[in-house]
Amino acid sequence: VYKLAANVVKVILKLMGSKARVYGEENLPKEGGFIIACTHTGYVDILNLGVAMYPREIHFMAKKQLFEMKGLGWLVKHLNAFPVDRDNPGPSVIKIPSQLLKEGKIVGIFPSGTRSADGTDLKQGAITIAQLAKAQIVPAAYVGARNAGDVMKRGKGYLIYGEPFYVTGKGKEGREQFTQHLEHELVALTEELQKRIPVK
């Protein structure tokens, strides 16, 4: 069903001219599990990342509200997403992605929410999972169409992958150090991507 969902999304985004132009694909690890931590502005970035990585499947951490939206809920569920309750995160927030990584799967985390505090928590979550699972993190940035309205206006999307890294720091101190590193990478990639977007 992932294949069907990915192809449905691909056709829609392509027809509307919103399928992302991708940079830095050489930075993606060729095999094994890893985390892809991508900037987040709306739900179109989730769809574009899934399409860009296809046929490799990503298991997305997605806020549970997305699963409750008509149509989009079906797509998100069948793009291997698993729900996360940001208000009451339980141990499964760490356990599920850690297990997927150990199985060699790719986990997608969108660590910049609408509020900066929310973004920091999710960045630290990505770093914690990478630290415990001893998995690589690939930072990524998305700029462009954010929602159905943008897609209907034929808004374009742009995606860039940065260089992967391991969380080599230990304990809380290591997590804080690498959370800052991830924040820096995401800002730098967003700036780099904005330079590459053709001026209208």
How would you describe each model-predicted region?
Residues 16, 30-88:
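Catalytic core of membrane glycerolipid acyltransferases/transacylases, capturing the structured
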Residues 27, 51, 86, 98-103:
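Short, charge-rich binding segments
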Residues 1-35, 44-45, 73, 78-80, ...:
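Membrane-anchoring hydrophobic helices of lipid-metabolizing enzymes
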Residues 92-200:
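Non-catalytic C-terminal accessory region of glycerolipid acyltransferases
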Residues 13, 53, 76, 100, ...:
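A generic structural signal for well-ordered alpha-helical segments
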Residues 22, 36, 60-61, 81, ...:
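Generic preference for hydrophobic
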Residues 26, 89, 143:
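Residue-level "edge-of-site" marker
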Residues 3-4, 44, 67, 91-92, ...:
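Residue-level recognition of alpha-helix initiation/capping sites
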